[in-house]
Amino acid sequence: MIVIGASPSPHADILKVAKKELKKEGYELEIKEYSDYVQPNTALESGDLDANYFQHKPYLDDFNKQKKTHLASAGTIHYEPFGIFPGKTKTLKALKNGATVAVPNDTTNEARALLLLQDQGLIKLKDGAGLTATKKDIVENKKDLAIKE
């Protein structure tokens, strides 16, 4: 029995297809779904899982550094697309001064979100912030957006 932890969608959905194919090859796969990004790594570190499937390499590296864990990547997979959704506002250009913008609360995905906001001209980050950018790296915020993690 191979036990893999995954986020519900798309990862667990993908594993459900793989489970059928693995069964044909004589393998049993158990999929444990997690709705957060911490538990699958702590479960893997403690030996409750054989593998997990939900994160990109920058997140894994940051998790190991922050939590002092020893997880390793088994290989590369697809990279989740990331987008900006205007919510109640019809377009990003229509965002009002002082509007609240939510970003992920983990280091690498927060940085990705901030880089997208910068690409849209909504904020400016200090030079070199890259995939470690946080709210503290915002050097220009003309619309005075409230960035909420």
Where are the predicted features?
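Short beta-strand->loop
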Residues: 70-78, 145-148
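Short, well-ordered beta-strand elements
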Residues: 1-9, 27-33, 100-101
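Alpha-to-beta junction loops
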Residues: 45-55, 99, 122, 143-146
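Ligand-binding "clamshell"
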Residues: 62-74, 89-90
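A conserved helix-loop-strand patch within extracytoplasmic ligand-binding domains
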Residues: 74-123
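Short, hydrophobic alpha-helical packing/hinge segments within bilobed ligand-binding/sensory domains
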Residues: 39-41, 49, 113
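Beta->alpha turn/N-cap motifs
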Residues: 9, 36-37, 47, 51-61, ...
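Short helix-initiation/N-cap motifs at beta->coil->alpha
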Residues: 31-42, 129-149
